[in-house]
UniProtKB/Swiss-Prot annotation:
It is found in: Cytoplasm. Keywords: Chaperone, Cytoplasm. Belongs to the GroES chaperonin family. The lineage of its organism: Bacteria, Pseudomonadati, Pseudomonadota, Gammaproteobacteria, Pseudomonadales. Heptamer of 7 subunits arranged in a ring. Interacts with the chaperonin GroEL. It comes from the Bacteria. It comes from Ectopseudomonas mendocina (strain ymp). This is Co-chaperonin GroES.
Amino acid sequence: MKLRPLHDRVVIRRSEEETKTAGGIVLPGSAAEKPNQGEVVAVGTGKVLENGEVRPLAVKVGDKVVFGPYSGSNTVKVDGEDLLVMGENEILAVIEA
């Protein structure tokens, strides 16, 4: 199944959570923090402005992004994978290599 977000929504695949600390301590699943990074897997058509124009999104499929700890409260399961759906305004930055 494919998910197509509407308007200024973005679908993100969260990066894998760290299961080991920098010191080598293995964390149980409940103690590991969910990362605030992920890859954009789908984007909407853009934000509809008050004058009716559509402003395209600044992120694109494949971008690695950083988002806030409480962003993406809408989680959907697609083909057994949990994906986050959030507004573009919840994305803090794009990671450039």
